Amino acid sequence: MKRIKMHHFGGKNICATWDEVAQTLEQTVDGVNEFYIAAEHTMFPYLAVLVKGDYAYVHCVPNETDGGLIAFSDDTPTDLPQDGISIFYTNTPTEEIEIYNDYVIPKTLAWTVVKDFVETGEMSNCVEWEEL
């Protein structure tokens, strides 16, 4: 695994192992956080992971000219209303962003997406991806 930089509401961590990444992912401010995850000294590709309680939203940006892709999973449903919207937080623990529940996945699945990304540098196959 390459060294990974993780920006989040609490600051920035440089992680050399999956255990360090996992410890960083557990950091929240009132149960929420936003993580920007990329290999150290690079900007792309990166994952943006928004976390709220047991749920997450994952957005991958492969390069600077790509709008990115959003993770979703029909195989791992949540108990959220299918046609609803969930509030997550971006930039600060108080700035709200609305996310369609179709793109909200269990936090445990998001951690698998992150693990695959930090170990391989590739997008995970454990979810489907929709291009923006």
Language model features: what each stretch is:
Residues M1-V32, V61-L132:
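Acidic, proline/glycine-rich low-complexity IDRs
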Residues A22-P62:
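Short, well-structured hydrophobic secondary-structure segments
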